[in-house]
Regions:
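Catalytic cores of nucleotide-sugar-dependent glycosyltransferases that transfer UDP/GDP/TDP-activated
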Residues: 1-206
Length: 206
């Protein structure tokens, strides 16, 4: 089986190490694994798995868009289109998503492909970003606006920090973008995050 993981980093930090640990275990079981990543260096022993999405310059431009326009996840359109072209050629059996924030991938372009691909999709959520209009860790300020619709984000100055607040628009866009994938399983590393995910508008009932 061919398995493709997508994460902001590969082989470093918590989520990057989770991906490479999974890749090593899956490879030992006879599967073929690739990890598409967006930024930073990959340790030598994990380069056999690594597929770079876009360029370092693209990450910087995406970061500027996020800072100026609260556009985290909505930059990197050209890079993501090129990556989707590569995915079609690679033709994985399973696509395992991890952190999609980090200024490296366009969620609209990615999910347009996932919705029409017919692929089995697994998404491991490592934080709250997927179901909020801005924040990655909404629980830090005990905010529950995300459950019905974000607005006036109390964490707009926190990662992914922005000069303006488009949390209301982002929340609505994410709800639309993340709906409609026919075969998608959501995984969380904790009961706490699972509880939040189940009642979120983006993943209600999954």
């Amino acid at each position: 089986m061919k398995i493709l993981m997508i994460n902001v980093v590969c082989g470093i930090r918590s989520t990057g190490r989770i991906c490479t640990d999974l890749a090593t275990a899956l490879e030992a079981q006879g599967h073929e694994v690739k990890i598409a990543y967006g930024r930073e260096k990959v340790p030598e022993q994990f380069k056999k798995y690594a597929v770079k999405i876009g360029s370092d310059w693209d990450v910087k431009v995406h970061g500027v868009k996020a800072r100026l326009l609260d556009g985290a996840g909505f930059g990197s359109k050209k890079a993501t289109k090129q990556f989707v072209k590569w995915m079609k050629e690679y033709d994985p059996d399973v696509i395992h998503l991890h952190n999609l924030h980090g200024y490296y991938i366009n969620i609209e372009v990615l999910f347009d492909y996932l919705k029409c691909s017919g692929k089995k999709v697994i998404w491991t959520l490592h934080d709250c970003w997927a179901f909020t209009g801005h924040s990655a860790y909404c629980d830090a300020v005990k905010c529950e606006r995300w459950s019905k619709g974000c607005y006036k984000c109390p964490q707009i100055k926190e990662y992914p920090k922005s000069f303006i607040d488009r949390s209301k628009q982002n929340w609505k866009k994410k709800k639309t973008i993340f709906s409609g994938v026919s075969d998608m399983t959501i995984i969380t590393p904790s009961h706490w995050l699972a509880g939040l995910t189940r009642v979120s508008a983006q993943f209600l009932g999954r």
